[in-house]
């Protein structure tokens, strides 16, 4: 049976989804599971949780714990699959720093984990650690597949694919939920008859085709999107809305509360949580995979000191990621007992790609995924060294990506503005030169639209100093 190593196993809820899924899969249920983390308490909590699932499911997985950098190589030794879910520097202090220093310069952000100055510095903290993983893997499990879930996805996956020999694919939820989110939001409903084609880059891949029973849904999507952004789309009663957005399935309490808040906001003000994406679709012609709060900071159009009214007009949640971190910390306190001290804990297989990929590689039964891979002629009007997100087939032969050809020119053009930052950040991680960090941030669409070159350099210098414990190579 395969060995699965989970890097960052203290991500307890995510470990439950990925490794719980493996325990629910016949081809993987007897796997040897190696949990690795640098936080003793979180590692122990994840192990307790997974042991309960293993026992209650009747699985025969062998669960092992590896604590700290000195045990990392042993955790990886002989692995067939390595799942990466680390965060270097955590919420406090690094995420706080990623928001507070730019704010001093007048640069406002929403999520700051994928692009912009926050995304660049998150990548520069993380790439050296992941390359350490890669060096160990090249020694003790050179044929393993690395399944990367950590952001910034394109930068980290691109670094692994160009700076190591490890077979790597980047995985993100946004492709899976793109069409269901769009169609349900617009009261069109999503079902198995819907077929889609999605390609581009992570967090900015494009819904190129969306059909139901062969009928192009885009004309109706755009008609409803315009009404929705004008506050004129009829969305029904709360009970009808809830059933539509949840596909009739039960929701965790916190999600239902947030959906109700969104519903009430729309009823009261005509504003909603996806206004940026729908505006981009109406202007560029195609819907983007990742959320409005992300895409508000990937472009120069929405967060602008000169036009402060855009924040309210498009319902842009500035400083959203720190709020989420605080909420997750608070919610973890209530979930800890449920997950780590519940002897009857069970699990239902989720939609996470990881177990389906491993199952396909073990059994040879193929599965289609959206994967982040190197652009070796896949999207012909994007740079060849870019990390692109395209449909892929996983089977016993590995990951086979699909050739897309040219994207619509306006879509490729917007992607290239983000790719510039991604490639320059990977170059900065390779050269360890401050000048390359400056260039990466200078190329960022949102940052360069708001700050002068001198301010960008000063901001980067201050960020480097603040992050010196996690980025000693640049200090």
Each model region followed by its residue ranges:
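N-terminal Rossmann-like dinucleotide-binding module
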Residues: 2-29
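Rossmann-fold NAD(P)-binding glycine/threonine-rich loop
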Residues: 92-162
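Internal, well-ordered domain-core segments that constitute the primary functional module
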Residues: 133-221
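Long, compositionally biased stretches enriched for glycine and/or charged residues
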Residues: 190-475
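Glycine-rich phosphate-binding loop and adjoining beta1-alpha1-beta2 segment
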Residues: 24-58
């Amino acid at each position: 049976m395969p060995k699965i190593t989970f890097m960052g196993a203290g991500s307890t809820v995510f470990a439950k989804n990925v490794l719980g899924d493996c325990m629910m899969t016949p081809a993987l249920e007897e796997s040897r599971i190696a949990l690795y983390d640098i936080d003793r308490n979180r590692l122990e909590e994840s192990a307790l949780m997974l042991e309960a699932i293993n026992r209650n499911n009747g699985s025969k997985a062998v669960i092992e714990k590896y604590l700290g950098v000195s045990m990392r190589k042993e955790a990886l030794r002989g692995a067939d699959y390595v799942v990466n879910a680390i965060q270097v520097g955590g919420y406090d202090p690094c995420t706080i720093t990623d928001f507070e220093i730019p704010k001093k310069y007048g640069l406002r952000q929403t999520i700051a984990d994928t692009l912009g100055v926050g995304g660049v510095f998150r990548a520069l903290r993380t790439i050296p650690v992941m390359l350490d993983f890669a060096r160990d893997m090249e020694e003790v499990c050179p044929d393993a597949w690395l399944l990367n879930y950590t952001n910034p996805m394109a930068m980290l996956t691109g670094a692994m694919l160009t700076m190591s020999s490890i077979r790597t694919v980047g995985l993100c939820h946004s492709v899976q939920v793109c069409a269901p989110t769009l169609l349900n939001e617009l009261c069109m409903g999503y079902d198995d008859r819907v077929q889609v084609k999605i390609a581009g880059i992570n967090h900015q891949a494009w819904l190129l085709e969306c059909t139901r029973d062969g009928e192009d849904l885009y004309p109706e999507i755009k008609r409803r999107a315009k009404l929705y952004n004008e506050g004129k789309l009829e969305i029904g009663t709360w009970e009808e809305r809830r059933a539509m957005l949840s596909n009739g399935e039960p929701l965790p309490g916190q999600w239902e509360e947030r959906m109700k808040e969104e519903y009430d906001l729309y009823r009261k003000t005509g504003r909603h949580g996806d206004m940026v994406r729908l505006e981009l679709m109406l202007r560029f012609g195609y819907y983007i995979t990742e959320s409005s709060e992300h895409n508000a900071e990937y472009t120069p159009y929405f967060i602008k000191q000169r036009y402060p009214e855009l924040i309210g007009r498009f319902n842009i949640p500035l400083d959203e990621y720190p709020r989420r971190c605080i909420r997750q910390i608070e919610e973890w306190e209530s979930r800890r007992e449920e997950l780590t001290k519940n002897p009857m804990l069970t699990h239902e297989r989720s939609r996470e790609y990881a177990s389906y990929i491993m199952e396909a590689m073990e059994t040879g039964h193929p599965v289609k995924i959206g994967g982040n891979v190197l652009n070796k002629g896949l999207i012909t009007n994007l740079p060849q060294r870019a990390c692109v997100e395209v449909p892929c087939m996983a089977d016993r032969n590995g990951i086979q990506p699909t050739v897309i050809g040219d994207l619509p020119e306006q879509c490729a053009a917007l992607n290239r503005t983000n790719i510039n930052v991604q490639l320059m950040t990977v170059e900065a991680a390779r050269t360890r030169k401050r000048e390359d960090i400056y260039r990466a941030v200078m190329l960022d669409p949102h940052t360069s639209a708001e700050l002068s070159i001198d301010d960008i350099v000063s901001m980067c210098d201050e960020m480097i100093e603040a992050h010196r414990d996690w980025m000693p190579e640049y200090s």
